[in-house]
Design a protein with these regions (language model features):
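Detector for small/aliphatic-rich hydrophobic stretches
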Residues: 1-82, 96, 101, 191-194, ...
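Long, charge-dense
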Residues: 81-138
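Short glycine-/polar-rich loops that comprise or flank the Walker A/P-loop
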Residues: 77, 100-102, 127-128, 153-156, ...
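Glycine-biased, small-residue-rich flexible motifs in mid-sequence functional cores and linkers
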Residues: 77-81, 91, 113, 121, ...
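A short acidic, amphipathic alpha-helical/loop segment
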Residues: 65-69, 93, 118, 142-146, ...
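Hydrophobic/aromatic beta-strand patches that form the interior of the parallel beta-sheet core
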Residues: 51, 81, 105-107, 132, ...
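Phosphate-binding/switch region of NTP-binding enzymes
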Residues: 157, 161-218, 226
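A contiguous pocket-lining binding segment that forms or flanks enzyme active sites
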Residues: 123-168
Length: 228
């Protein structure tokens, strides 16, 4: 058999180079942002694995970042389970992103332990499509419990955490979000593949669906279900 040129071998889909995004055949859900999907293994949010989204404070665009995926999954009948958010989500804003309010569950907790428990149970449930808990100081062993809970599931575990969160984490993907004028900067801290040196600037507001129709339709949707 004739030897193949080295470049031909290196360009084979089964070969991964350390300076490129990992080519992995893993389940994923598109983020809704082509620039971000292009640099994520699998082309979207990893399903069945933890993703951490870090920010210096709530309201830096972290929730808007996951709205396209949340809309896709709630429209298919899966639950969006919001665990211990720092503020009550504005229902018309969710609708403007295409989220079905009838598939949104708001879980109120009294402690970090309750938040972790609620997150773990949600990740074990195959009815939940997107589980974004707001977690503060969470030890690595607790994160590993969450990773174990989501294994074998195709849900998205998108953990919102403060920017000072410890670097040691079992999460397959870690992002940091910050504001820059009218755009949101997304910096990849960890992924399967090489690092991304420059942040990606995203226009989160450009993903809103037509405001008039969907927002008006919010009155006809069921209210967000709350669980205490």
């Amino acid at each position: 058999m004739a030897a193949q040129p080295l470049e031909t071998v290196l360009n084979h889909p089964a070969v991964w180079r350390g300076n490129e995004c990992a080519r992995v055949a893993v389940p994923s859900v598109p983020t809704g942002f082509a620039e971000l999907d292009a640099v994520l293994p699998g082309g979207g949010w990893p399903a069945g694995a933890l993703t951490e989204i870090l920010s210096e404070r709530p309201g830096m665009g972290e929730l808007q970042l996951v709205m396209p995926a949340a809309a896709r999954l709630t429209q298919s009948g899966r639950w969006l389970t919001l665990i211990a958010p720092p503020y009550i989500p504005y229902a018309p804003a969710l609708v403007s992103h295409g989220v079905h309010l009838s598939r949104v569950m708001l879980v109120k907790t009294a402690s970090a332990e309750e938040s972790l428990w609620a997150c773990e149970q949600s990740l074990r449930s195959h009815g939940c499509g997107v589980v974004p808990p707001w977690l503060d100081r969470t030890p690595e062993r607790s994160l590993r419990r969450l990773q174990h809970a989501i294994e074998g599931n195709d849900a998205l575990a998108l953990l919102f955490r403060p920017g000072r969160a410890i670097p040691a984490s079992p999460a397959a993907l870690r992002l940091h979000v910050s504001k820059s004028q009218s755009r949101t900067l997304v910096r990849i801290l960890k992924r399967r593949g090489s690092d991304i040196p420059a942040p990606i600037a995203l226009d989160l507001h450009g993903k809103l669906v037509g405001r008039t129709g969907p927002v008006r339709a919010a009155a006809n949707q069921l209210p967000i279900e709350e669980v205490a």
